[in-house]
Swiss-Prot record:
This is RNA-binding protein YbxF. Gene3D superfamilies: 3.30.1330.30. Belongs to the eukaryotic ribosomal protein eL8 family. The keyword Acetylation does not apply. Pfam families: Ribosomal_L7Ae (PF01248). The gene is ybxF.
Amino acid sequence: MSYEKVLQAGKIVIGTKQTIRALKEGEATEVIVAEDADLPIIEKVTAAANEANVPVTKVDSMKKLGKACKIQVGAAAVAILR
Protein backbone atom coordinates (compact mmCIF):
# COMPACT_ATOMS: atom_id res chain seq x y z
CA MET A 1 0.00 0.00 0.00
CA SER A 2 1.17 3.53 -0.76
CA TYR A 3 0.96 4.72 2.84
CA GLU A 4 3.61 2.11 3.68
CA LYS A 5 5.80 3.36 0.81
CA VAL A 6 5.73 6.82 2.36
CA LEU A 7 6.58 5.43 5.80
CA GLN A 8 9.53 3.45 4.39
CA ALA A 9 10.84 6.14 2.05
CA GLY A 10 14.18 7.65 2.97
CA LYS A 11 13.49 11.16 1.70
CA ILE A 12 10.14 12.78 1.02
CA VAL A 13 8.69 16.23 0.50
CA ILE A 14 5.21 17.04 1.74
CA GLY A 15 2.73 19.41 0.13
CA THR A 16 1.69 20.53 -3.31
CA LYS A 17 4.26 23.29 -3.84
CA GLN A 18 7.22 21.20 -2.67
CA THR A 19 6.05 18.20 -4.69
CA ILE A 20 5.80 20.26 -7.89
CA ARG A 21 9.22 21.81 -7.20
CA ALA A 22 10.76 18.34 -6.72
CA LEU A 23 9.20 17.20 -10.01
CA LYS A 24 10.53 20.21 -11.92
CA GLU A 25 14.00 19.69 -10.45
CA GLY A 26 13.98 15.99 -11.37
CA GLU A 27 14.31 14.82 -7.77
CA ALA A 28 11.04 12.88 -7.42
CA THR A 29 10.79 9.17 -8.21
CA GLU A 30 7.11 8.78 -7.32
CA VAL A 31 4.22 11.03 -6.34
CA ILE A 32 1.40 10.13 -3.98
CA VAL A 33 -1.81 12.19 -4.24
CA ALA A 34 -4.84 12.06 -1.94
CA GLU A 35 -8.13 11.60 -3.82
CA ASP A 36 -10.02 13.75 -1.32
CA ALA A 37 -7.85 16.79 -2.08
CA ASP A 38 -9.31 19.63 -4.16
CA LEU A 39 -9.59 18.68 -7.84
CA PRO A 40 -7.43 21.59 -9.13
CA ILE A 41 -4.61 20.46 -6.81
CA ILE A 42 -4.85 16.85 -7.98
CA GLU A 43 -4.85 17.97 -11.63
CA LYS A 44 -1.89 20.33 -11.17
CA VAL A 45 0.27 17.72 -9.41
CA THR A 46 -0.73 14.95 -11.84
CA ALA A 47 0.07 17.15 -14.86
CA ALA A 48 3.50 18.04 -13.43
CA ALA A 49 4.21 14.36 -12.73
CA ASN A 50 3.15 13.32 -16.24
CA GLU A 51 5.38 16.03 -17.71
CA ALA A 52 8.31 14.68 -15.67
CA ASN A 53 7.43 11.03 -16.49
CA VAL A 54 7.02 10.22 -12.80
CA PRO A 55 4.39 7.68 -11.70
CA VAL A 56 1.42 8.95 -9.66
CA THR A 57 -0.28 6.80 -7.04
CA LYS A 58 -3.61 7.85 -5.58
CA VAL A 59 -4.64 7.19 -2.00
CA ASP A 60 -8.04 7.78 -0.45
CA SER A 61 -7.32 10.16 2.42
CA MET A 62 -5.34 13.35 3.02
CA LYS A 63 -5.53 12.69 6.75
CA LYS A 64 -4.03 9.19 6.43
CA LEU A 65 -1.36 10.48 4.04
CA GLY A 66 -0.41 13.18 6.54
CA LYS A 67 -0.27 10.58 9.31
CA ALA A 68 2.02 8.40 7.16
CA CYS A 69 4.29 11.46 6.82
CA LYS A 70 4.27 11.81 10.61
CA ILE A 71 2.52 15.19 10.58
CA GLN A 72 -0.60 16.19 12.48
CA VAL A 73 -2.49 17.58 9.47
CA GLY A 74 -3.59 16.21 6.12
CA ALA A 75 -1.32 16.15 3.08
CA ALA A 76 -2.68 16.52 -0.45
CA ALA A 77 0.54 15.43 -2.16
CA VAL A 78 3.83 13.78 -1.25
CA ALA A 79 6.87 13.14 -3.43
CA ILE A 80 9.32 10.33 -2.76
CA LEU A 81 12.80 11.56 -3.62
CA ARG A 82 15.81 9.82 -5.12
